[in-house]
């Protein structure tokens, strides 16, 4: 573990209950969920979440290291806080997450006004590090080299009353040449199925309707259990999906991300046969060129990928399939790029997260010859975007006239106030902006509505025909009351002492 670094930091500690915090999150769903844990830790230590638009006494950056612009964004935001830190020495700044794990030796050099640097393996140390930095007037840098405590054993202050992330594993055993995540998050460690289901049950007991199972590679779940007494089980993920289907009150189950190399038919069968598993699949492709996939060490080829898509659609005809794509991987030729366009055209993705290759120091791909010129990458990227936008619009236009069930959400529609619409997600994950009509004041985030699609755009659907059904839910009650679920149910790694009691359920029956 990296030890303390001497650096002038904050002054004596004011009363914790009077101090506020803000967590700023960059990156993937794993980071979003980790930020919920960071918030839970700080609230458990006596700090209060800062109000909207207020200057917080403690600002925590939970960082991403996947792309170069994440570095630039972090240090730009840190520089914006420097004048405030200078005028208010009691303010504290903490940097955690993947970028902190990677840049442990340089964060303070680039931003010496930072008080705490912590990594991906020791997020539970944040309150103690803040106290130590404030008491000793010494900035704290503490980076663990291996997981100290399974993160889900930590308290989590959830962002939503109706939808929740549930980690089934941390880390990754794959060796994709473009990805730095395994080096920063470590080897895969899986939670026991019973512990995952206990957390899901706790969330449902508090009114949550939708959970998303999280892992870097959910298809590998079951081969690296944290508990050495738990037998390896390559069919564990399909069994976990089916077990979620037996939890009364859990209406929607999603998962991310699977890996094409290990995606098996038992998972497809579980998806098709478990009613609350949503008809959606996010399956990263990255490239349609077998030559580039080999250079990426992706362990599958385009034919296998397309075969999975065909089998999913045969079992779940209306499944919405999304993907990740990288343009401009080192050595990519026009022929390779055309192969990607061909697979995208054949796959008919409802949407895609498309990225220009970003060279990351510490990854094998960064050392490869034939780095593609930026102008070439940009031109190819635009062609891919144009193709996928056309496909997305065609796929969404095909939804017009269909009846959809929506879980009403908050923060999904930037123009909702101007258009008098609300927003929600269909069971297949599509974003729908809908007109609530005369009952609009009665519809709350967390409620469930049924409406008919009347219009389409590449990234969303419109439903202006009014509501067919509106069901008030406990999640909607909780949102209206400003209540959010909390978890921290002991999970998958040995712990000391008895777990805290589960929170009492609130709200009326659904």
UniProtKB/Swiss-Prot annotation:
Residues 397-467 form the TRAM domain. Its main location: cytoplasm. Keywords: 4Fe-4S, Cytoplasm, Iron, Iron-sulfur, Metal-binding, S-adenosyl-L-methionine, Transferase, tRNA processing. Residues 19-135 form the MTTase N-terminal domain. It is found in: Cytoplasm. One of its GO terms (molecular function) is N6-isopentenyladenosine methylthiotransferase activity. It catalyses: N(6)-dimethylallyladenosine(37) in tRNA + (sulfur carrier)-SH + AH2 + 2 S-adenosyl-L-methionine = 2-methylsulfanyl-N(6)-dimethylallyladenosine(37) in tRNA + (sulfur carrier)-H + 5'-deoxyadenosine + L-methionine + A + S-adenosyl-L-homocysteine + 2 H(+). SUPFAM superfamilies: Radical SAM enzymes. Its EC number is 2.8.4.3. [4Fe-4S] cluster 2 binds at residues 172, 176, 179. Residues 477-510 are annotated as: Disordered. The keyword RNA-binding does not apply. CDD domains: Radical_SAM. [4Fe-4S] cluster 1 binds at residues 28, 64, 98. Residues 158-394 form the Radical SAM core domain. Pfam families: Radical_SAM (PF04055), UPF0004 (PF00919). InterPro entries: Elp3/MiaA/NifB-like_rSAM (IPR006638), Methylthiotransferase (IPR005839), Methylthiotransferase_CS (IPR020612), Methylthiotransferase_N (IPR013848), Methylthiotransferase_N_sf (IPR038135), MiaB_methiolase (IPR006463), rSAM (IPR007197), rSAM_horseshoe (IPR023404). Catalyzes the methylthiolation of N6-(dimethylallyl)adenosine (i(6)A), leading to the formation of 2-methylthio-N6-(dimethylallyl)adenosine (ms(2)i(6)A) at position 37 in tRNAs that read codons beginning with uridine. Belongs to the methylthiotransferase family. MiaB subfamily. Monomer. This is tRNA-2-methylthio-N(6)-dimethylallyladenosine synthase. It comes from Mycolicibacterium vanbaalenii (strain DSM 7251 / JCM 13017 / BCRC 16820 / KCTC 9966 / NRRL B-24157 / PYR-1).
């Amino acid at each position: 573990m990296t030890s303390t670094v001497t650096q002038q930091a904050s002054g004596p500690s004011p009363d914790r209950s009077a101090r506020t915090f803000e967590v700023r999150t960059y990156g993937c769903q794993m980071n979003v969920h980790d930020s919920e844990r960071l918030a839970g830790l700080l609230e458990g230590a006596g700090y209060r979440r800062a109000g909207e638009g207020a200057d917080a006494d403690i600002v925590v950056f939970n960082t991403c290291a996947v792309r170069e612009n994440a570095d630039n964004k972090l240090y730009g935001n840190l520089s914006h806080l420097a004048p405030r830190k200078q005028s208010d020495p009691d303010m504290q700044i903490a940097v955690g997450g993947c970028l902190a794990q990677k840049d442990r030796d340089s964060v303070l050099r680039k931003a010496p006004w930072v008080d705490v640097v912590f990594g991906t393996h020791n997020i539970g140390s944040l309150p103690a590090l803040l106290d130590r930095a404030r008491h000793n007037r010494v900035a704290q840098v503490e980076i663990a080299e291996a997981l100290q405590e399974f993160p889900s054993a930590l308290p989590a202050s959830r962002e939503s009353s109706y939808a929740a992330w549930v980690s089934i594993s941390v880390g990754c055993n794959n060796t994709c040449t473009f990805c730095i995540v395994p080096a920063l998050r470590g080897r895969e460690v899986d939670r026991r199925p019973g512990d995952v289901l206990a957390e899901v049950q706790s969330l449902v007991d508090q009114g949550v309707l939708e959970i998303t199972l999280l892992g870097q590679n959910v298809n590998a779940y079951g081969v690296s259990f944290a508990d050495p007494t738990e037998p390896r089980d390559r069919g564990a993920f399909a069994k976990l999906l089916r077990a979620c289907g037996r939890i009364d009150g859990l209406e929607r189950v999603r998962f991310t991300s699977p890996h094409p190399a290990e995606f098996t038919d038992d998972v497809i069968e579980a998806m098709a046969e478990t009613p609350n598993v949503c008809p959606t699949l996010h399956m990263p492709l990255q490239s349609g060129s077998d030559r580039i996939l080999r250079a990426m060490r992706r362990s599958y080829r385009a034919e296998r990928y397309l075969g999975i898509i065909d089998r999913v659609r045969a079992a779940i005809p209306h499944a919405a399939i999304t993907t990740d794509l990288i343009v401009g991987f080192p050595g990519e030729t026009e022929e390779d790029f055309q192969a990607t366009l061909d697979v995208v055209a054949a796959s008919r993705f409802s949407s895609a997260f498309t990225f220009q290759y970003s060279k990351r120091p510490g990854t094998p791909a960064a050392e490869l010859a034939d780095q593609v010129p930026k102008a070439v990458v940009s031109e190819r990227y635009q062609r891919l975007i144009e193709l996928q936008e056309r496909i997305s619009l065609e796929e969404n236009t095909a939804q017009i006239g269909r009846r959809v069930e929506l879980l009403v959400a908050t923060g999904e529609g930037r123009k909702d106030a101007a258009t008098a619409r609300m927003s929600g997600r269909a069971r297949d994950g599509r974003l729908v902006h809908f007109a609530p009509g005369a009952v609009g004041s009665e519809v709350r985030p967390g409620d469930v509505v049924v409406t008919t699609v009347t219009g389409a755009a590449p990234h969303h659907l419109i439903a202006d025909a009014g509501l067919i059904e509106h069901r008030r839910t406990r999640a909607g009650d909780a949102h209206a009351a400003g209540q959010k679920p909390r978890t921290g149910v002991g999970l998958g790694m040995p712990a000391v002492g008895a777990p805290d009691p589960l929170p009492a359920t609130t709200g009326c029956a659904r």
